Every structure is written in C-alpha cells, then in structure tokens.
Amino acid sequence: MKRILIALVRFYQRFISPVFPPSCRFELTCSNYMIQAIEKHGFKGVLMGLARILRCHPWSKTGKDPVPDHFSLKRNQEGE
C-alpha cells in the first residue's frame, strides 16, 4: 500500500508539479513531506500530508516543518 501511495505522489512530482510555478512555503516541499510521512506512518501519513497541504498558504508561517516521529496533524514545532 505504501508503494502505491508513494508512486502517486511521485507521479504528481514528475508530471503535474512542473506545470505550475513553485509555491510551497516550507523547506521540505509538501509532496516530499507526504512521501516521508507515508514512509514513517503508513496510511496515516496521507492524512498528515493533506493537513500539511492545507497549512501551505500565503498567510502561513514559512520554514522547516519536518515529519514528526509520532502521528500528528499539527505543525512540528521542533522544526522552528
């Protein structure tokens, strides 16, 4: 299951993302965050990645937001 989910994100990175200008506000891009979250947390990592995408908007804080070792839908405060 992890491999399929990661393959979908890689498809997005290779074929869809290049069509749009870079817009991620975090140092680890949202798609790379999703891949790392899936690798660490399995399907829960998808939820973490979606929460991260919702946090990535023009009015949010920028900077580092690494994938936490524990499941959480909040921003990782250790990355600041």
UniProtKB/Swiss-Prot annotation:
Reported function: Could be involved in insertion of integral membrane proteins into the membrane.
Superkingdom of the organism of origin: Bacteria
Any one GO CC term of the record: plasma membrane
Region (Disordered): 61-80
PANTHER family: MEMBRANE PROTEIN INSERTION EFFICIENCY FACTOR-RELATED
Membrane topology, as annotated: Peripheral membrane protein
Biological source species: Streptococcus pneumoniae serotype 2 (strain D39 / NCTC 7466)
Stored SMART domains: Haemolytic (SM01234)
Family: Belongs to the UPF0161 family.
Compositional bias (Basic and acidic residues): 62-80
UniProt keyword list: Cell membrane, Membrane
Subcellular location: Cell membrane
InterPro entries, sorted: Membr_insert_effic_factor_YidD
Keyword Cell membrane in record: yes
Protein name: Putative membrane protein insertion efficiency factor
